[in-house]
Amino acid sequence: MAPRKKKQAAEAARVSAADLHVKGLKSEVQEQPITDTLKYNYMPYAMSVIVSRAIPEIDGFKPSHRKLLYTMYQMHLLGGARTKSANIVGATMKLNPHGDAAIYDTMVRLSKGYGALLHPFVDSKGNFGKVYSRDMAWAASRYTEARLDGICVEMFRDIDQNTVDFVDNYDGKLKEPSLLPTTFPNILVSANKGIAVGMASDICGFNLGEVCDTTIALMENPNHDILSTLLAPDLPTGGELLYDEKILRSIYETGRGTFKVRAKWRYIPKQNVIEIYEIPYSTTTEAIVDKVVELVKLGKLKEISDIRDETDLSGLKLAIDLKRGNAPEKTMQKLFRLTPLLDSQSCNFNVLINGQPRVMGVRE
């Protein structure tokens, strides 16, 4: 090889070697059994999602919920005037580094305006959307305001009396509570849903008064029949629960199961219109309208001439115009059979206990 070509080859080898050690990284192929790869790469990620994001803990909150509410508590928003949501989001980033959009989404879900909880923790002002609407966008954080709702007094009671442990935040500069010292079983009152890696959690809410009565009854008598005081799940969007004692008792004992909920409706004779004013928690007004329109086009719902979403500030309302000669009761039975106006609500009471996921019955 000519001297010039040798020099060029050596230079190319030097550049290639430099590329392989950029910032101390060395390019190489490692042979590793797939079981070891899963153990050292996949499992840490999976556990991070389970423990730090998706599954609620025994106080009824996910880490993102707890960080937001504690930040608002530190901002003295438990009572007094509201502040801009953007201000709260910015302050929360000191504890939650996931970005402003994720934090604001969390605030929306916990808000009174959104309506996803029986007892919301955020007293909101402005457009926070609605849980029963798929397409209703909430306003940007710079336009809305919020403060803690009155029920949060029970979330933070005696938090400064060593009732819970405090841990470092992500950069070790601040402290945050590992749990909130709730004075009632919030895990059963606030609906919660999360999808992790290889597991999920779907906890339906229950009536606060019934939960407290049942808790007191269990303290007085450990053998108390829970179903006699905790009658059934209570859903924020209302609807009628199709009661089945055997199914509910199984859900209460095992923490798993499914029950059915259907919409509430009324008939307006003068207008020959069916009005839907409560729908199952698991669906949306848009999904219902889309399904009805699809069935009408396919010729499977010939009794209906039109459907409109007339939801306004007074509440949810879907108006269904009937053709003459069609009985509203029979039409509704058909709608329940063919559309999400009758839907299933799944239960999977998967909760983190000391960092370990565990499916628990209501008694536990």
Where do the PLM segments sit?
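Catalytic phosphate-handling regions of large nucleic-acid enzymes and associated NTPases
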Residues: 2-255, 317-319
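Charged, surface-exposed alpha-helical interface/stalk elements
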Residues: 226-246, 253-364
